């Protein structure tokens, strides 16, 4: 982390306003970002993430590192609107709403942290990133590569301040050894379908029912829909616990 902090300081000295940290899960991205905020000493900071649970843990870590009173840190999400604090921890879902962004000036925060920045190509993230003009913006991720080909590095000026992948983290004993269980599939094919709420064998469908089913399947296979679903599956399955999903079409 010392190397990363030195690199970040050097990038800012060179006039760069954006950088990205690629760090395997469990190697201390949150604490690293907190230490960088401590050395920058911004007037106001915004920390963006997808889940409120992540924000609450980050808030605890930042308070330990910064040594500031809890009253200086605030949660900005669906159930909490502490946007007037010095250090604001916000869900991207809440912050990206147009009516919410309209409440903040472009230079409201002079340091912005974007966690799980591999999602930055999503419209919600783009609205937040495009709206604000901080002195410095730091993106953090363990997996910068995206299946849709979007280049996250370009969003941050191709400034990789520090990179440590999973294999290197294991070799340097930064992480405990673990067993990896691959998930081969997320869905299970059913032997029949439901038409108007009734179970119908596929082979016994009428031509009209088959055409209707084909239309539904074409809509489900829309590339944008598929990418969105894959992104959500990856987010909610990261914890390694069994996940069930329900789709409406």
Regions found by a protein language model. Name each.
Residues 150-244:
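Interdomain helical connector at the RecA1-RecA2 junction of SF1/SF2 helicase-like NTPases
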């Amino acid at each position: 982390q010392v190397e990363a902090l030195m690199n970040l300081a050097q990038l800012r000295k060179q006039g760069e306003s954006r950088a990205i940290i690629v760090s395997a899960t469990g190697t201390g991205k949150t604490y690293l970002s907190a230490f960088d905020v401590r050395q920058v000493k911004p007037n106001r900071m915004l920390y963006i993430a997808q889940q409120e649970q992540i924000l609450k843990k980050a808030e605890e870590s930042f308070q330990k590192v910064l040594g500031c009173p809890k009253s200086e840190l605030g949660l900005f999400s669906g159930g909490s609107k502490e946007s007037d604090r010095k250090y604001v921890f916000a869900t991207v879902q809440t912050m990206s709403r147009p009516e919410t962004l309209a409440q903040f000036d472009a230079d409201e925060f002079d340091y912005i942290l974007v966690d799980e920045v591999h999602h930055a190509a999503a419209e919600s993230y783009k609205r937040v990133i495009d709206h604000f003009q901080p002195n410095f913006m730091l993106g953090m991720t363990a997996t910068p590569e995206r299946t849709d080909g979007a280049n996250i590095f370009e969003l941050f000026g191709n400034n990789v301040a520090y990179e440590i992948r999973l294999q290197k983290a294991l070799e340097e004993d930064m992480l405990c050894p673990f067993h990896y269980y691959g998930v081969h599939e997320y869905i299970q094919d059913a032997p029949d379908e439901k038409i108007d709420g009734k179970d119908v064998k596929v082979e016994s469908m009428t031509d009209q029912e088959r055409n209707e089913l084909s239309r539904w399947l074409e809509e489900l296979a829309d590339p944008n829909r598929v990418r969105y679903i894959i992104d959500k599956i990856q987010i909610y399955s990261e914890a390694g616990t069994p996940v069930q999903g329900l789709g409406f079409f």
